């Protein structure tokens, strides 16, 4: 199966500037293709997982993945489908975030000097040195304001009479220049991105054709939601991060283990590397025992992101908690100052402080709704004082929010 055939078969395809021609070229030769990521956090989350799996697919088929860490464009902010302007990041924040993002990507693709090894750049390397007057003279003439105003992402803000600064309006020009720069210096002939980036991608391809007369392509992926319409990558407890310093492998496993029934097969196709035969077997398993299929999905995706050992450990922890009723030492742990527990803290404050509720009011709601447990016993009073008398034999307090989220509190 070719790169494009597998790309479509896995459900990645949404739109392409010339699919037939790109299919032919990728069969005949190896290309360089790029995807860009904004430097807005110290880790990528599963909202970027499709794009990451595409980079991995490119590499597996012998093509060269190029990753752009948008340090330069992060100084401006992409207005695409945003209701308001983004906060502009400092150089220090961008550098810190870029390091974390490379850590996320390195879990899935190999960086190096080989023909199909991935390479990564921060677009600040070329954007910072752009001379504004020369940029306007050499490139500005190729962009139509008329066309830019018709792009849905811009039109939406204008129709709502929301502020769209000139700073943000320049984002699409700079993204187009990124594609031009990579085409010129690294022979990059394909830009990939989410369907919300279509307008920006097409502008870059058009710029290259006008200036360099080179054949390049743009291809987008669908914007994914869960079957209930929730945005991928976000939960009530926060983002589902790929880096273990922000989300433990156990919690990563639990996210996939608890996905909606209707998403299980789709997620296996999108995010795992099960073969066609294995996927057929997985579909049969899902039809017979959906919970067994969810465990299989969670195991495979945790193994891919973290390691096989991490996946085994997460599975064992889940079995001990949910099937054997034990406290497991590998549960996510929060350490509190001993003085705090000696004095005592109300139950609702504790659930908020350890991250099991996004606010104190949410913590109260959790307890009132009979969703909070301490040491596997239902919390009846949100104001009950939790102190050192609640410590178990293993010198820990087990907090549970619902059936799936658990934390050990230690001093």
Swiss-Prot record:
Its main location: cytoplasm. InterPro entries: aa-tRNA-synth_Ic (IPR002305), Rossmann-like_a/b/a_fold (IPR014729), S4_RNA-bd_sf (IPR036986), Tyr-tRNA-ligase (IPR002307), Tyr-tRNA-ligase_bac-type (IPR024088), Tyr-tRNA-ligase_bac_1 (IPR024107). A motif ('HIGH' region) lies at residues 39-48. It comes from the Bacteria. GO terms for biological process: tyrosyl-tRNA aminoacylation. Its EC number is 6.1.1.1. One of its GO terms (molecular function) is RNA binding. Disulfide bonds: none annotated. L-tyrosine binds at residues 34, 171, 175. It is found in: Cytoplasm. Residues 345-411 form the S4 RNA-binding domain. GO terms for cellular component: cytosol. Keywords: Aminoacyl-tRNA synthetase, ATP-binding, Cytoplasm, Ligase, Nucleotide-binding, Protein biosynthesis, RNA-binding. ATP binds at residue 234. It is an enzyme of class 6 (ligase). It catalyses: tRNA(Tyr) + L-tyrosine + ATP = L-tyrosyl-tRNA(Tyr) + AMP + diphosphate + H(+). A motif ('KMSKS' region) lies at residues 231-235. HAMAP family: Tyr_tRNA_synth_type1 (MF_02006). Homodimer. Catalyzes the attachment of tyrosine to tRNA(Tyr) in a two-step reaction: tyrosine is first activated by ATP to form Tyr-AMP and then transferred to the acceptor end of tRNA(Tyr). Belongs to the class-I aminoacyl-tRNA synthetase family. TyrS type 1 subfamily. This is Tyrosine--tRNA ligase.
């Amino acid at each position: 199966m070719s790169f494009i055939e597998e790309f479509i078969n896995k459900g990645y395809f949404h739109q392409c500037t010339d699919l037939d021609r790109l299919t032919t070229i990728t069969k005949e030769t190896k290309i360089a293709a790029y995807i860009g990521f904004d430097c807005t956090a110290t880790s990528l989350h599963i909202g970027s997982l499709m794009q990451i799996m595409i980079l991995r697919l490119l590499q597996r088929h012998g093509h060269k993945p190029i990753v752009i860490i948008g340090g330069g464009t992060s100084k401006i902010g992409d207005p695409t489908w945003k209701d308001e302007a983004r906060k502009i990041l400092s150089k220090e924040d961008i550098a810190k975030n870029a390091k974390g993002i490379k850590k996320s990507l390195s879990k899935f693709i190999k960086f190096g000097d080989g023909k199909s090894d991935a390479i990564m750049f921060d677009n600040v390397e070329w954007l910072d040195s752009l001379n504004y007057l020369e940029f306007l003279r050499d490139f500005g003439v190729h962009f139509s304001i008329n066309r830019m105003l018709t792009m849905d992402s811009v039109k939406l803000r204008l129709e709502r009479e929301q502020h769209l600064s000139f700073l943000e309006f320049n984002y699409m020009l700079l993204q187009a220049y990124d594609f031009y720069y990579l085409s010129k210096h690294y022979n990059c002939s394909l830009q990939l991105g989410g369907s919300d980036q279509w307008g920006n991608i097409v502008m870059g391809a058009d710029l290259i054709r006008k200036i360099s007369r080179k054949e390049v392509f743009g291809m987008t992926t669908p914007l994914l939601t869960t079957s209930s319409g929730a945005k991928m990558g976000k939960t009530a407890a926060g983002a589902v991060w790929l880096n273990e310093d922000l989300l433990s492998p156990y919690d990563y496993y639990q996210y996939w283990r608890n996905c909606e029934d209707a998403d299980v097969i789709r997620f296996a196709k999108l995010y795992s590397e099960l073969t066609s035969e294995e996927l057929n077997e997985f579909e049969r398993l899902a039809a017979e025992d959906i919970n067994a299929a969810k465990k299989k999905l969670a195991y495979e995706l945790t193994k891919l992101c973290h390691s096989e050992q991490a996946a085994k450990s997460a599975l064992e922890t889940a079995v001990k908690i949910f099937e054997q009723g034990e406290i497991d030492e590998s549960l996510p742990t929060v350490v509190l100052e001993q003085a705090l527990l000696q004095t005592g803290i109300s139950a609702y404050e504790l659930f908020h402080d350890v991250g099991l509720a996004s606010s104190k009011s949410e913590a109260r709601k959790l307890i009132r709704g009979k969703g909070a447990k301490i040491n596997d016993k239902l919390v009846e009073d949100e104001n009950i004082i939790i102190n050192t008398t609640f410590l178990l034999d293993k010198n820990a307090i087990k907090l549970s929010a619902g059936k799936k989220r658990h934390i050990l509190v230690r001093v």
